Amino acid sequence: MESLGATVKKPGSTVKNKTGSWRTFKPVLDKDKCIDCDNCILFCPEGCINREHEIDYDYCKGCGICAEKCPVKAIKMEREK
């Protein structure tokens, strides 16, 4: 089976309803560790990470997939304050 990569251009399926308030943990990127592999962008189910690796916290639900898929552990999940 062949797979095709894709990214979501707009965050979330409901642009009008910001869903970031659902989070318990949020991803925090250490840009010094980042190797620009773009796994975080490709695997984010909400499309909350842009090409500059900025995270749109208005829509990020804190699922942690970006941190899990980062090969150099440049993304850490931190508890919301």
UniProtKB/Swiss-Prot annotation:
Top-level lineage group: Archaea
Note describing how the cofactor binds: Binds 2 [4Fe-4S] clusters.
InterPro entries linked: 4Fe4S_Fe-S-bd, 4Fe4S_Fe_S_CS, PorD_KorD, Pyruvate_synthase_PorD
Domain 4Fe-4S ferredoxin-type: 25-50, 51-80
Molecular function as annotated in GO: 4 iron, 4 sulfur cluster binding; metal ion binding; oxidoreductase activity, acting on the aldehyde or oxo group of donors, iron-sulfur protein as acceptor
SUPFAM superfamilies assigned: 4Fe-4S ferredoxins
Signal peptide: none
Residues binding [4Fe-4S] cluster 2: C44, C60, C63, C66
Keywords associated with the record: 4Fe-4S, Electron transport, Iron, Iron-sulfur, Metal-binding, Repeat, Transport
Names of the cofactor(s): [4Fe-4S] cluster
Binding annotation for [4Fe-4S] cluster 1: C34, C37, C40, C70
Subunit structure: Heterotetramer of one alpha, one beta, one delta and one gamma chain.
Entry protein name: Pyruvate synthase subunit PorD
Organism from which the protein derives: Methanothermobacter thermautotrophicus (strain ATCC 29096 / DSM 1053 / JCM 10044 / NBRC 100330 / Delta H) (Methanobacterium thermoautotrophicum)
